Amino acid sequence: PVVIGATQKAGCMGAAYEFLFNIEKWLREQHIRKKVDLYWITPEDYLGHFGIDGMPGGETMLKGFMKIFHIHYRKQVAVEEVMADGVKLNTGEVISSKFVMLMPPFTGVDFIRNSPALEALPNGFLDVEGTYQHKKYKNVWAAGLTVDVPAPFTSKKVPYAVPKTGYPSDETGKIVAENIVRIARGK
């Protein structure tokens, strides 16, 4: 058996879904798919939430893919333990496995955590103003993964986060640059 998924507090479900369907395809190409039980585990309240409160038709589409490709899935679950031969979920279920790939939560980098003056949140991210300026130090700016992004939703059973991928990081970087230029010009 193969277990693919995302752990509690993870925020990059898309990459894990992509890995799931890539490995499913690879197993078919190797002519061994019928011999391998494939499991998807996720803290999401529903398939296709992606940490963005879903997309129109996403849940229906993913349920269809899970059925077509014979993928077992568990939603609203947390990982309690990864063992040599399985994954234990918070429900008490143990899914045996020979291979596991789990997307962990994003956390802040060590230099932020090791800089007490920056007052990082417990997850290692910085709490910033809407301009991406530090709330206390106006000469400190943050963008991308460094920024704490509050979720625009409430997880029902198991916590998970918003995605922090390349595009949002790129966009916050541009906003920071524009705000620095604006302030430097006295606007």
Segments from the language model and where they lie:
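A Rossmann-like FAD-binding core segment of flavoenzymes
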Residues: 25-128
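Rossmann-like NAD(P)H-binding beta-loop-alpha module
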Residues: 1-36
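Amphipathic alpha-helical segments in well-structured domains
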Residues: 16-20, 59, 125, 166-169
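Internal hydrophobic alpha-helix adjacent to the cofactor/substrate pocket in enzyme cavities
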Residues: 25, 33, 165-187
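Cofactor-binding loop segments of dinucleotide-utilizing enzymes, especially the Rossmann-like FAD-
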Residues: 7, 43-45, 145
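FAD-site-proximal beta/loop scaffold in flavoenzymes
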Residues: 1, 96-99, 103-171
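Short, flexible/disordered intra-domain loops and linkers
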Residues: 12-16, 48-54, 154-161
